[in-house]
Amino acid sequence: MNHTLNEIIKIKNQWFSQHVDVDFPTKESLLGRALFLSDANNRTSYQLKVLPKTNSEYAEDGIFKVDFHRLTVIFSLLQSQRWGSSTDQALVVEFLSQIIFSPPCDLYVGFLQGEPAAAAVVTKYGNSLLVSDIVTTSSNHESFLSTLLNHSSLAIEKYSDIYIEPHRI
């Protein structure tokens, strides 16, 4: 793994962790953080060489940058599906629902036919961008990823290095 990729993953994980670094975090939030970060440390990433063409399964107007609590909850519920036990899922939801919107990470959720169907985290670091924690309710995350990468809110042309850290439900 190259230095930039290591650094951007470290920044993303620190960003997630900081949301429960408060005076009185709940036990559940801390346990959820431990689960989430343990999973994050067991993933592989790759550098994207060619920007994929937008796939028609997800429309750009069906992908939203998370900017209010209800979308945070939807993001949290989608992410929690990565864990098999309902207890672990509840802990991860408790942890992720503490997120406060701030740079360098942005959360995104995707909808298909009005139903939550995908989520991802976008971390920006210099002229590098990491799309991570990609979860989809379908077996193919490529269609969500292609539309997200071409989403007007990302301004992808600003980034010389794009890294992908996939994960499927």
Segment roles from a protein language model:
Residues M1-E60, I162-I169:
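Acyl-donor-binding surface of acyltransferase catalytic domains
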Residues R43-T44, T87-Q89, Y108-L112, E142:
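A short linear-motif detector with a strong N-terminal bias
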